[in-house]
Amino acid sequence: LKKCMDSIEEKSTYRNFEFIIVENNSTEEETFAYYKEIEKRDNVRVLYYKEDFNYSRINNFGAKEANGEYVLLLNNDTEMIEPDSIKEMLDVCMRPDVGIVGAKLIFEDNTIQHAGVIIGFGGVAGHAFIGQDRDDNGYFSRIISVQDLSAVTAACLMVRRSVFDEVEGLNEEFKVAFNDIDFCLKVRKAGYLVVYNPYAQFYHYESKSRGQEDSADKVARFQQEIGLFGERWGELLEHGDPYYNPNLTLDKADFSLKE
C-alpha cells in the first residue's frame, strides 16, 4: 500500500484526488501504524470493512464514501509508472459516451499483466497479451492503442460516479472472480463504452496481497462464480467477444490464429 500511495503522491501530474483506503482484516501491526501516519493527511481516509473478503462489496463500500465525480478502483499491490496515468484515464472517462477506462498493467518482471480483457479466453475471460514483453506492440498494435473493449480489470479501473451508481456498482454475488468483467458488461449494457488506455501504466504485483486459489473451498467458490457468469452472460460467451476476431484462438492470449 505504501509503495502504491507514494508512487501516486510523488509522480502523478494530476493532483485533485483523495485516497480512500478500505481496510479488510489485516493483522500486521505495521499496517495499522501506517494508517495512523497517513490519516493525518487532508486527502486520506481509512475505512474499516470487518466482514469476510468480498472484492465487490469492499469496492462498493469504498466508492459510496467517495466525494469525486470519478472513482479510480485501484488494488493496493500496484505502483504508478507513468506520471500522466490518472490524467490520461480521466481525459477519456470525461467523454459522455464512456463509462469505464482501464490501464496497461505490468508484472514485476516487465511483462504484460493486463492490456484489456477478452471474453472467451480460457472458457470465460482472460487478459489480452499476458506475459508478452511490456514494449511489444501486439497484434495490429493493440497493446499500444487506445481502444474500446468489452472489459478491463478492476485492479486499476476508472468509472464515472454517476455510471457506477446507475448500474448499482459491482455485483456482490461475485466475491472474488469475474466481478470486474461483470461490472464492465453491465456498464456496456447500460449504453456506455469501456476503453483501454495504454498511456496509463502501473506495475501490478498480482496476488501478493491475497494469495492464490489453492484450497478446496476457494476452488469450489471459483467454480460457482464461473457458473454464475455463464448464467448472466451465456449469450455473449456463445456468440463471442465483439472486439475479438473469431478466427483467432481462445486458448492463448497472444491473438494467434486458431489451429
Predicted regions and their residues:
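Conserved short acidic donor-positioning loop in nucleotide-sugar-dependent glycosyltransferases
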Residues: 24-26, 53, 77
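Short aromatic/hydrophobic "clamp" motif used to bind/position activated sugar donors
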Residues: 71
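Acidic donor-binding segment of Leloir-type glycosyltransferases
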Residues: 9-48
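Conserved donor NDP-sugar-binding/catalytic core segment of glycosyltransferases
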Residues: 78-124
